[in-house]
Amino acid sequence: MESGGEGMNPVYEKLCACYESIRARIPFTPEIALVLGSGLGNYASKMEVVERIPYGDIAGFPVSTAPGHVGQFVFGYVEGAPIVAMQGRVHYYEGYDMTDVVLPIRLMKMMGAEILFLTNAAGGIRQGFSAGDLMLITGQIATFVP
């Protein structure tokens, strides 16, 4: 991944810069990317952890201001599967540009992840849902992502 060059997309250039700043610290090619939403940050303790990379160590990477968000990538294994997990993430409501909000997902793809699990705290009006239930997203509105 080379950054720079005439006419390169600035979003892609920033992505490449983030990747280059941590490439040597990535211990393996992750197959699975996991975003640990509110209340799930401790899931990383169930992993066989190999490396932790704080977001602040990544050149140009957005850092969360939300309370309780650790702000690091955790590389490790769960039942033999190589995983990169995000402990904390940035949110659009924190004032970040949407390109920064989605940058971590694009970075995990650049690391090699082919499977993505997104988790978050959510509310719903459907009767029968209880705290801790899993809900599957069947559609999304992606009008903000450039």
Which role does the model predict for each range below?
Residues 7-146:
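Metabolite-binding pocket within alpha/beta catalytic cores that recognizes anionic/polar moieties
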Residues 1-7:
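Short, Lys/Arg-enriched N-terminal segments with co-localized hydrophobic residues
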